[in-house]
């Protein structure tokens, strides 16, 4: 954000002109968008434990074989690993939301994840369902209009959904 402000000031200075109304409006829009991002990240982060726990609970209710003897989430150690992985995906999604860029999610979280799950015998389709459940919860929490920056958040919610979709597709 600082770079955008510095660029506008530098351009105006090189022309020997004041910053135009259009440039001020563009910077105001950028600040408002940044505030909405921060609100969304803060809400998702503040509710991350509930998002992960509720998504896992819903996943295991739909796919009880996962927690039955012989299932991929059977035993407390495997369950803990499943919850940890869901939390890691959610954390990297928040990084992508904050930056407005999926590359950190792709490079540091999703790159090679499908292959890891295949090697471990973890059903990627089940992981994708869990990610989808986190997506629904995170968007509902982030899109709550109470106590956040006002304005149309539909584009941001769509963007947030795309990060979860990217994660689900990477493991399916």
Swiss-Prot record:
In this entry, which stretches build a coiled coil? none
Q: Where in the cell is it found?
A: Cellular thylakoid membrane
Describe the task this protein carries out. Answer: Light-harvesting photosynthetic bile pigment-protein from the phycobiliprotein complex (phycobilisome, PBS). Phycocyanin is the major phycobiliprotein in the PBS rod.
User: Could you tell me which InterPro entries the record lists for this protein?
Assistant: Globin-like_sf, Phycobilisome_asu/bsu, Phycobilisome_asu/bsu_sf, Phycocyanin_b
In the record, the note on similarity to other proteins reads:
Belongs to the phycobiliprotein family.
Q: Provide a GO biological process annotation.
A: photosynthesis
The record's subunit annotation is: Heterodimer of an alpha and a beta subunit, which further assembles into trimers and the trimers into hexamers.
NCBIfam families in UniProt: phycocy_beta
The record lists (2R,3E)-phycocyanobilin 1 as bound by 82
The membrane topology term of the UniProt record is: Peripheral membrane protein
Looking up Gene3D superfamilies in the UniProt record yields: Phycocyanins (1.10.490.20)
Q: Which Pfam families match?
A: Phycobilisome
Q: Which residues bind (2R,3E)-phycocyanobilin 2?
A: 153
Keywords from the named record:
Antenna complex, Bile pigment, Chromophore, Electron transport, Membrane, Methylation, Photosynthesis, Phycobilisome, Thylakoid, Transport
Under what name is this protein listed? C-phycocyanin-1 beta subunit
Organism listed in the record: Pseudanabaena tenuis (strain PCC 7409)
């Amino acid at each position: 954000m600082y770079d955008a402000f510095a660029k506008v000031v530098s351009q105006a200075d090189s022309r020997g002109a004041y910053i135009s109304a259009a440039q001020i409006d563009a910077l105001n829009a950028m600040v408002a968008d940044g505030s909405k991002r921060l609100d969304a990240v803060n809400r998702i982060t503040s509710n991350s434990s509930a998002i992960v726990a509720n998504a896992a609970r819903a996943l295991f209710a739909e796919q009880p074989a996962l927690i039955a003897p012989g299932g991929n989430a059977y035993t407390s150690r495997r369950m803990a690993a499943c919850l940890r992985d869901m939390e890691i995906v959610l954390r990297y999604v928040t990084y992508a939301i904050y930056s407005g860029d999926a590359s950190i999610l792709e490079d540091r979280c999703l790159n090679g994840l499908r292959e890891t799950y295949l090697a471990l015998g973890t059903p990627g389709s089940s992981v994708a369902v869990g990610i989808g459940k986190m997506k629904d919860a995170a968007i509902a929490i982030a899109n709550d209009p109470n106590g956040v920056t006002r304005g149309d958040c539909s584009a941001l919610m769509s963007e947030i959904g795309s990060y979860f979709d990217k994660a689900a597709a990477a493991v399916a």
